Amino acid sequence: KGFTVTLLTRVSKHKNLIESLGIQVLDWPFTRGGGNIFGGVRSIVYIMRAIKHSNSNIIYAVAIKPIIFSSLAATLSGVKNKIFTLGGVGFIFSSNRVLARMIRPVLIKVLRLALKGHKTRLILQNKDDREMFLGYKIIENERIILIRGSGVDTDKFFPRKLRKNLTTIILPARMLWDKGVREFVSCAQQLKEDGVTARFCLVGGVDIQNPESVSVAQLKKWTDQKVVEWWGNQNNMSEIYSRSTIICFPSYREGLPKSLLEAASSGLPIVAYDVPGCREIVIDGVNGFLIPFKDDNSLRDAILKLVKDQDLCHSMGFLGREMVLKNFSQKIISEQTLSVF
C-alpha cells in the first residue's frame, strides 16, 4: 500500500519471519505487568529513538501501556498522526478488585491525555467499550472507529467432521480467573457428578504478569482430581478446534476475542456469558447460547443441551461459520483497518 513499516516490539523467535515481509524490526525490552516510572521513561526514550531512526510520520500502537508511552513519545517527537487499537479494556476496567478501583480514575485521566489531538484516532472492537469511553469522557465519538476484531483466517480455521466419540468441551483462553476458569471448572464438576460423559479441557497458558492469573499448582490440582484436563499453551489452535465439540467461554469481559472468532470459523457452537465482546460474536439460539453473567445453572444447562444434541451442535456451528465469512474474515477486517491510515 506504499507504507514503509517499522515494528517496535520485544524481539522473539518470529523476528526473521516478520522481516521477510519487508518490515523492519527494532527491539523494545517491554514488559506488560508491573513496571515503574523508570521503566516507563525508558520505554518512551526507546520509542522516540525508533521514531527518529525510522523517520515515522504515523504512530500505531496496540494495548493500554504501549498507547500511553507511544502517544507521549510521538508528541515529544512532533508526530501528530496517531492511531491506537484497544482489543479490550483490561484488568483495570473489568475487575472489581480494590487495586483496580484505585488505579482506574488515574488511568482515565492518563488516557484522556494520551488520546488528545484531532489527528489521534482510537479503534475499539465493540460497542460497549465505545460507550464506556464516551461515558468517562476519555475521547470524542468522532475520533472512535469501531472495527470488530482483528480478523480470522477462514482457510486455516474451517469446519471438520464432528467426531462421534467422546464429547470434548474446551475453554480456549489464558488461565485467568476473569476468563471464567473457575466457572468452567465448576460446570465440569457438576455435569460429571450428574453422570455426563465428556472431556472438559482448559487450553491456554498461565500469565504470571496478570493479577488474575490462576496458579500452575491449582491447575495441576484440578487435573489430578480428574475434574478437567489442562492442555497448556497450544500453537496450533486449528488442530485443537478440530478435536473439539463445544466451546465454553464464561469470560467476564472481552474486546472481541479472537479465540471465539476462530472457533466460530471452525464450525463450533459457543456458550458464553452475555458480556461485552462475546455478544458481538454469539447470537443467542443461533450460533450458540448467551448466558446471564455468572448464572452457573444456565451455563450448565446450555452445555448439557448441546452435549445431548449433535444436530444442534452442527447447525449452530454452520451458522457461526457463515457469520464469520460475512463479517469477520481477515480480508474484511484488514481492509477496514487499512482505511483508517
Sequence positions of predicted segments:
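Glycosyltransferase donor-sugar binding loop
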Residues: 8-13, 172, 199-214
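Aromatic "clamp/platform" in nucleotide-sugar-dependent glycosyltransferases that forms part
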Residues: 233, 252
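A short, well-ordered alpha-helix in the C-terminal region of glycosyltransferases
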Residues: 298, 305, 312-327, 333-339
